[in-house]
Protein backbone atom coordinates (compact mmCIF):
# COMPACT_ATOMS: atom_id res chain seq x y z
CA UNK A 1 0.00 0.00 0.00
CA UNK A 2 1.08 3.57 -0.61
CA UNK A 3 2.47 5.48 2.36
CA UNK A 4 1.68 8.82 0.73
CA UNK A 5 -0.01 10.99 3.39
CA UNK A 6 -2.10 12.73 0.71
CA UNK A 7 -3.49 9.39 -0.49
CA UNK A 8 -4.12 8.22 3.08
CA UNK A 9 -5.90 11.48 3.90
CA UNK A 10 -8.08 11.21 0.79
CA UNK A 11 -9.03 7.63 1.63
CA UNK A 12 -9.91 8.63 5.21
CA UNK A 13 -12.27 11.28 3.88
CA UNK A 14 -13.93 8.73 1.57
CA UNK A 15 -14.38 6.44 4.58
CA UNK A 16 -16.18 9.23 6.42
CA UNK A 17 -18.44 9.98 3.45
CA UNK A 18 -19.39 6.32 2.94
CA UNK A 19 -20.07 5.75 6.64
CA UNK A 20 -22.31 8.81 6.73
CA UNK A 21 -24.21 8.28 3.50
CA UNK A 22 -24.28 4.56 2.63
CA UNK A 23 -25.63 1.39 4.21
CA UNK A 24 -22.54 -0.07 5.85
CA UNK A 25 -24.04 -2.36 8.49
CA UNK A 26 -23.99 -6.13 8.29
CA UNK A 27 -27.11 -7.43 6.56
CA UNK A 28 -27.17 -11.17 7.27
CA UNK A 29 -25.22 -11.18 10.54
CA UNK A 30 -26.24 -9.71 13.89
CA UNK A 31 -24.25 -9.09 17.06
CA UNK A 32 -25.93 -12.09 18.67
CA UNK A 33 -26.78 -9.99 21.73
CA UNK A 34 -30.47 -10.37 20.87
CA UNK A 35 -30.10 -14.06 21.76
CA UNK A 36 -29.59 -13.13 25.40
CA UNK A 37 -32.02 -11.66 27.91
CA UNK A 38 -31.00 -9.48 30.83
CA UNK A 39 -33.05 -10.78 33.77
CA UNK A 40 -35.75 -8.32 34.87
CA UNK A 41 -36.28 -8.09 38.63
CA UNK A 42 -39.64 -6.66 39.63
CA UNK A 43 -38.44 -6.47 43.25
CA UNK A 44 -35.14 -4.72 42.69
CA UNK A 45 -33.66 -3.39 45.91
CA UNK A 46 -31.67 -0.63 44.25
CA UNK A 47 -32.12 3.12 43.92
CA UNK A 48 -31.67 4.47 40.41
CA UNK A 49 -29.84 7.48 41.80
CA UNK A 50 -27.30 5.24 43.52
CA UNK A 51 -26.36 3.03 40.56
CA UNK A 52 -22.58 3.03 40.19
CA UNK A 53 -21.36 2.81 36.59
CA UNK A 54 -17.71 3.47 37.42
CA UNK A 55 -15.06 1.23 35.92
CA UNK A 56 -11.32 0.96 35.49
CA UNK A 57 -9.45 0.13 32.32
CA UNK A 58 -5.68 -0.12 31.91
CA UNK A 59 -5.38 1.41 35.37
CA UNK A 60 -7.41 4.50 34.46
CA UNK A 61 -10.63 5.33 36.32
CA UNK A 62 -13.75 5.81 34.18
CA UNK A 63 -17.05 7.28 35.33
CA UNK A 64 -18.80 4.79 33.03
CA UNK A 65 -17.67 1.59 31.24
CA UNK A 66 -17.48 3.22 27.82
CA UNK A 67 -14.78 4.04 25.31
CA UNK A 68 -15.36 6.12 22.22
CA UNK A 69 -14.18 3.72 19.53
CA UNK A 70 -11.54 4.37 16.88
CA UNK A 71 -12.91 6.36 13.97
CA UNK A 72 -10.69 8.68 12.00
CA UNK A 73 -7.54 10.76 11.70
CA UNK A 74 -5.55 12.32 8.92
CA UNK A 75 -8.39 13.86 6.92
CA UNK A 76 -9.20 17.58 7.11
CA UNK A 77 -12.50 16.86 8.84
CA UNK A 78 -10.85 14.45 11.28
CA UNK A 79 -9.57 17.22 13.55
CA UNK A 80 -13.09 18.52 14.15
CA UNK A 81 -14.45 15.02 14.70
CA UNK A 82 -11.72 14.01 17.13
CA UNK A 83 -11.83 17.22 19.16
CA UNK A 84 -15.60 16.98 19.55
CA UNK A 85 -15.35 13.32 20.56
CA UNK A 86 -12.57 14.08 23.04
CA UNK A 87 -14.42 17.04 24.53
CA UNK A 88 -17.47 14.85 25.15
CA UNK A 89 -15.27 12.11 26.63
CA UNK A 90 -13.71 14.63 29.02
CA UNK A 91 -17.11 15.91 30.13
CA UNK A 92 -18.47 12.40 30.74
CA UNK A 93 -15.33 10.84 32.21
CA UNK A 94 -15.04 8.06 29.64
CA UNK A 95 -12.17 6.87 27.43
CA UNK A 96 -11.35 7.36 23.77
CA UNK A 97 -9.48 5.53 21.02
CA UNK A 98 -7.93 7.48 18.18
CA UNK A 99 -8.23 6.42 14.56
CA UNK A 100 -5.24 4.87 12.83
CA UNK A 101 -2.11 7.00 13.30
CA UNK A 102 -0.35 5.42 10.34
CA UNK A 103 -0.16 8.77 8.59
CA UNK A 104 1.92 10.11 11.50
CA UNK A 105 4.70 7.61 10.74
CA UNK A 106 5.66 9.52 7.60
CA UNK A 107 8.61 11.82 8.30
CA UNK A 108 7.81 14.36 5.62
CA UNK A 109 4.15 15.26 5.25
CA UNK A 110 2.73 13.21 8.10
CA UNK A 111 3.57 16.01 10.54
CA UNK A 112 0.78 18.18 9.14
CA UNK A 113 -1.76 15.42 9.59
CA UNK A 114 -0.73 14.96 13.22
CA UNK A 115 -2.88 17.93 14.23
CA UNK A 116 -6.01 15.88 13.50
CA UNK A 117 -5.09 13.64 16.45
CA UNK A 118 -4.23 16.46 18.88
CA UNK A 119 -6.97 16.28 21.50
CA UNK A 120 -5.13 16.54 24.82
CA UNK A 121 -5.85 20.26 25.04
CA UNK A 122 -9.59 19.55 25.29
CA UNK A 123 -9.29 16.19 27.07
CA UNK A 124 -6.44 16.38 29.59
CA UNK A 125 -7.82 13.64 31.84
CA UNK A 126 -9.19 11.15 29.32
CA UNK A 127 -7.83 7.62 28.92
CA UNK A 128 -6.49 8.08 25.39
CA UNK A 129 -5.58 5.04 23.31
CA UNK A 130 -3.46 5.47 20.18
CA UNK A 131 -3.88 3.24 17.16
CA UNK A 132 -1.77 1.52 14.51
CA UNK A 133 -2.37 -1.38 12.13
CA UNK A 134 -0.85 -4.80 12.78
CA UNK A 135 0.47 -4.79 9.21
CA UNK A 136 2.44 -1.61 9.92
CA UNK A 137 3.78 -2.71 13.32
CA UNK A 138 7.26 -3.84 12.36
CA UNK A 139 10.24 -3.79 14.70
CA UNK A 140 11.72 -0.98 12.62
CA UNK A 141 8.54 1.07 13.00
CA UNK A 142 8.42 0.83 16.80
CA UNK A 143 10.40 4.06 17.46
CA UNK A 144 8.11 6.01 15.11
CA UNK A 145 5.01 4.47 16.71
CA UNK A 146 6.29 5.38 20.18
CA UNK A 147 6.97 8.93 19.00
CA UNK A 148 3.44 9.19 17.58
CA UNK A 149 1.99 8.04 20.89
CA UNK A 150 4.08 10.54 22.84
CA UNK A 151 3.10 13.34 20.50
CA UNK A 152 -0.62 12.86 21.13
CA UNK A 153 -0.20 12.09 24.82
CA UNK A 154 -1.63 8.58 24.55
CA UNK A 155 -1.84 6.25 27.54
CA UNK A 156 -1.94 3.02 25.54
CA UNK A 157 -1.80 1.62 22.01
CA UNK A 158 -4.50 -0.24 20.11
CA UNK A 159 -3.18 -2.50 17.37
CA UNK A 160 -5.86 -3.31 14.82
CA UNK A 161 -5.77 -6.66 13.03
CA UNK A 162 -7.76 -6.03 9.86
CA UNK A 163 -6.86 -8.63 7.24
CA UNK A 164 -10.31 -8.65 5.59
CA UNK A 165 -10.51 -4.87 5.43
CA UNK A 166 -7.04 -4.68 3.88
CA UNK A 167 -7.95 -7.40 1.34
CA UNK A 168 -10.90 -5.28 0.18
CA UNK A 169 -8.96 -2.01 0.15
CA UNK A 170 -7.31 -0.76 -3.04
CA UNK A 171 -3.58 -1.39 -2.57
CA UNK A 172 -4.18 -2.75 0.91
CA UNK A 173 -1.51 -4.38 3.08
CA UNK A 174 -2.31 -8.05 2.55
CA UNK A 175 0.87 -9.71 3.87
CA UNK A 176 0.21 -10.67 7.49
CA UNK A 177 2.80 -13.44 7.57
CA UNK A 178 4.96 -13.14 10.67
CA UNK A 179 2.63 -10.55 12.20
CA UNK A 180 2.21 -12.49 15.45
CA UNK A 181 5.94 -12.44 16.06
CA UNK A 182 6.10 -8.75 15.20
CA UNK A 183 3.26 -8.05 17.61
CA UNK A 184 5.12 -9.86 20.38
CA UNK A 185 8.38 -8.03 19.64
CA UNK A 186 6.71 -4.62 19.45
CA UNK A 187 4.76 -5.16 22.67
CA UNK A 188 8.02 -6.01 24.43
CA UNK A 189 9.71 -2.86 23.12
CA UNK A 190 6.88 -0.37 23.66
CA UNK A 191 6.48 1.22 27.06
CA UNK A 192 2.70 1.26 26.66
CA UNK A 193 -0.10 -1.23 27.34
CA UNK A 194 -1.13 -2.82 24.03
CA UNK A 195 -4.76 -3.52 23.17
CA UNK A 196 -5.27 -5.95 20.29
CA UNK A 197 -8.44 -5.27 18.35
CA UNK A 198 -10.26 -6.14 15.16
CA UNK A 199 -12.21 -3.57 13.18
CA UNK A 200 -15.62 -5.24 13.09
CA UNK A 201 -15.06 -8.82 11.95
CA UNK A 202 -14.24 -10.25 15.36
CA UNK A 203 -11.53 -11.81 17.50
CA UNK A 204 -12.48 -15.26 18.77
CA UNK A 205 -11.12 -18.47 20.24
CA UNK A 206 -8.86 -19.34 17.30
CA UNK A 207 -7.00 -16.02 17.42
CA UNK A 208 -6.61 -16.19 21.19
CA UNK A 209 -5.20 -19.72 20.92
CA UNK A 210 -2.58 -18.42 18.48
CA UNK A 211 -1.64 -15.64 20.90
CA UNK A 212 -1.29 -18.05 23.80
CA UNK A 213 1.02 -20.32 21.81
CA UNK A 214 3.58 -17.53 21.40
CA UNK A 215 6.79 -17.84 23.44
CA UNK A 216 6.20 -15.99 26.67
CA UNK A 217 2.42 -16.30 26.43
CA UNK A 218 -0.07 -13.52 25.76
CA UNK A 219 1.86 -10.55 24.32
CA UNK A 220 -0.87 -7.93 24.80
CA UNK A 221 -2.44 -6.27 27.82
CA UNK A 222 -6.03 -6.42 26.60
CA UNK A 223 -8.35 -7.37 23.75
CA UNK A 224 -11.16 -5.56 21.96
CA UNK A 225 -13.25 -8.24 20.24
CA UNK A 226 -14.69 -5.74 17.69
CA UNK A 227 -17.20 -8.33 16.55
CA UNK A 228 -19.55 -8.61 13.61
CA UNK A 229 -23.05 -7.17 13.61
CA UNK A 230 -22.42 -3.45 13.42
CA UNK A 231 -20.35 -1.69 10.76
CA UNK A 232 -18.77 -4.00 8.19
CA UNK A 233 -15.44 -2.58 7.07
CA UNK A 234 -15.35 -5.09 4.25
CA UNK A 235 -18.53 -3.43 3.01
CA UNK A 236 -17.12 0.08 3.56
CA UNK A 237 -13.95 -0.67 1.61
CA UNK A 238 -15.86 -2.21 -1.28
CA UNK A 239 -18.06 0.86 -1.54
CA UNK A 240 -15.02 3.15 -1.41
CA UNK A 241 -13.10 1.09 -3.96
CA UNK A 242 -15.80 0.07 -6.44
CA UNK A 243 -18.76 2.29 -5.66
CA UNK A 244 -20.77 -0.90 -5.20
CA UNK A 245 -20.82 -4.19 -3.32
CA UNK A 246 -18.96 -6.77 -5.43
CA UNK A 247 -18.43 -9.43 -2.78
CA UNK A 248 -21.57 -9.57 -0.61
CA UNK A 249 -20.52 -12.77 1.15
CA UNK A 250 -17.30 -11.11 2.30
CA UNK A 251 -19.26 -8.09 3.51
CA UNK A 252 -21.18 -10.31 5.93
CA UNK A 253 -18.28 -12.42 7.25
CA UNK A 254 -17.16 -12.31 10.85
CA UNK A 255 -17.58 -13.53 14.42
CA UNK A 256 -20.70 -12.03 16.04
CA UNK A 257 -19.90 -9.75 18.96
CA UNK A 258 -21.64 -11.83 21.64
CA UNK A 259 -19.93 -15.01 20.47
CA UNK A 260 -16.56 -13.26 20.46
CA UNK A 261 -17.04 -11.93 24.01
CA UNK A 262 -17.88 -15.39 25.34
CA UNK A 263 -15.00 -17.11 23.53
CA UNK A 264 -12.35 -14.60 24.57
CA UNK A 265 -13.55 -14.37 28.16
CA UNK A 266 -13.59 -18.16 28.53
CA UNK A 267 -10.02 -18.37 27.25
CA UNK A 268 -8.76 -15.31 29.14
CA UNK A 269 -10.71 -14.93 32.39
CA UNK A 270 -8.71 -12.00 33.77
CA UNK A 271 -7.56 -10.03 30.71
CA UNK A 272 -9.08 -6.55 30.21
CA UNK A 273 -11.78 -7.00 27.58
CA UNK A 274 -13.56 -4.47 25.38
CA UNK A 275 -16.84 -5.33 23.67
CA UNK A 276 -17.43 -3.46 20.43
CA UNK A 277 -19.12 -4.12 17.12
CA UNK A 278 -22.77 -3.11 16.93
CA UNK A 279 -23.08 -1.76 20.48
CA UNK A 280 -25.89 0.70 19.91
CA UNK A 281 -27.91 0.91 23.14
CA UNK A 282 -27.49 0.83 26.88
CA UNK A 283 -29.15 -2.58 26.86
CA UNK A 284 -26.52 -3.82 24.39
CA UNK A 285 -23.84 -2.58 26.78
CA UNK A 286 -25.47 -4.19 29.80
CA UNK A 287 -25.65 -7.56 28.03
CA UNK A 288 -22.05 -7.30 26.81
CA UNK A 289 -20.78 -6.52 30.30
CA UNK A 290 -22.91 -9.28 31.82
CA UNK A 291 -21.32 -11.67 29.31
CA UNK A 292 -17.88 -10.73 30.58
CA UNK A 293 -16.68 -7.49 28.99
CA UNK A 294 -15.06 -4.85 31.18
CA UNK A 295 -16.08 -1.93 29.00
CA UNK A 296 -17.80 -1.33 25.67
CA UNK A 297 -16.73 0.83 22.73
CA UNK A 298 -18.96 2.81 20.39
CA UNK A 299 -17.87 4.34 17.10
CA UNK A 300 -20.06 4.92 14.04
CA UNK A 301 -23.22 6.11 15.85
CA UNK A 302 -21.11 9.02 17.11
CA UNK A 303 -19.77 10.06 13.70
CA UNK A 304 -22.62 12.35 12.63
CA UNK A 305 -22.94 13.94 16.10
CA UNK A 306 -19.15 14.50 16.13
CA UNK A 307 -19.34 16.49 12.91
CA UNK A 308 -22.05 18.63 14.49
CA UNK A 309 -20.61 19.43 17.94
CA UNK A 310 -19.21 18.08 21.18
CA UNK A 311 -22.59 18.77 22.78
CA UNK A 312 -24.30 16.53 20.21
CA UNK A 313 -21.86 13.71 21.02
CA UNK A 314 -22.40 14.23 24.73
CA UNK A 315 -26.16 14.17 24.28
CA UNK A 316 -26.08 10.87 22.37
CA UNK A 317 -23.82 9.28 24.96
CA UNK A 318 -25.85 10.60 27.89
CA UNK A 319 -28.96 8.84 26.59
CA UNK A 320 -26.89 5.67 26.18
CA UNK A 321 -25.60 5.92 29.77
CA UNK A 322 -29.06 6.71 31.15
CA UNK A 323 -30.40 3.53 29.54
CA UNK A 324 -27.48 1.49 30.88
CA UNK A 325 -28.16 2.82 34.37
CA UNK A 326 -31.83 1.80 34.15
CA UNK A 327 -30.77 -1.67 32.97
CA UNK A 328 -28.67 -2.17 36.10
CA UNK A 329 -31.39 -0.76 38.34
CA UNK A 330 -34.16 -2.97 36.97
CA UNK A 331 -32.16 -6.19 37.03
CA UNK A 332 -31.13 -5.55 40.63
CA UNK A 333 -27.48 -4.68 40.04
CA UNK A 334 -25.94 -1.85 42.05
CA UNK A 335 -22.71 -1.79 40.06
CA UNK A 336 -20.89 -3.53 37.22
CA UNK A 337 -19.58 -6.32 39.42
CA UNK A 338 -23.07 -7.27 40.52
CA UNK A 339 -24.26 -7.01 36.91
CA UNK A 340 -21.70 -9.66 35.92
CA UNK A 341 -22.78 -11.79 38.87
CA UNK A 342 -26.40 -11.64 37.68
CA UNK A 343 -25.40 -12.44 34.11
CA UNK A 344 -27.74 -13.01 31.19
CA UNK A 345 -30.09 -15.77 30.12
CA UNK A 346 -29.65 -17.40 26.72
CA UNK A 347 -32.87 -17.40 24.68
CA UNK A 348 -33.49 -20.79 23.08
Swiss-Prot record:
Pfam families: FMN_dh. Substrate binds at residues 11-12, 100-102, 165. Its cofactor is FMN; NADPH; Mg(2+). One of its GO terms (cellular component) is cytoplasm. It comes from the Bacteria. One of its GO terms (biological process) is isoprenoid biosynthetic process. Keywords: Cytoplasm, Flavoprotein, FMN, Isomerase, Isoprene biosynthesis, Magnesium, Metal-binding, NADP. Disulfide bonds: none annotated. Its EC number is 5.3.3.2. It catalyses: isopentenyl diphosphate = dimethylallyl diphosphate. FMN binds at residues 70-72, 100, 131, 197, 231, 278-280, 299-300. The keyword Cytoplasm applies. SMART domains: IMPDH (SM01240). One of its GO terms (molecular function) is oxidoreductase activity. It is found in: Cytoplasm. Mg(2+) binds at residue 166. The keyword NADP applies. Belongs to the IPP isomerase type 2 family. Involved in the biosynthesis of isoprenoids. Catalyzes the 1,3-allylic rearrangement of the homoallylic substrate isopentenyl (IPP) to its allylic isomer, dimethylallyl diphosphate (DMAPP). HAMAP family: Idi_2 (MF_00354). NCBIfam families: IPP_isom_2. This is Isopentenyl-diphosphate delta-isomerase. It comes from Mycobacterium marinum (strain ATCC BAA-535 / M).
Amino acid sequence: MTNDPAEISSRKRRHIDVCLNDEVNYVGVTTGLERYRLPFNALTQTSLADIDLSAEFFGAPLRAPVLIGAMTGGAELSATINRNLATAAQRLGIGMMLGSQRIMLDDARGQRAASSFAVREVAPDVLLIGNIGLAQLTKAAVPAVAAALRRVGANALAVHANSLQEAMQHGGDTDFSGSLGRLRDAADLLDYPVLLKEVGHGIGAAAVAQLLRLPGGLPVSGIDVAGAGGTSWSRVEQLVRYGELRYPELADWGIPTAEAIVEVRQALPAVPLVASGGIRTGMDAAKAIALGADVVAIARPLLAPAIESATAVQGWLQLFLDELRVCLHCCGARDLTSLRDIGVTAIR
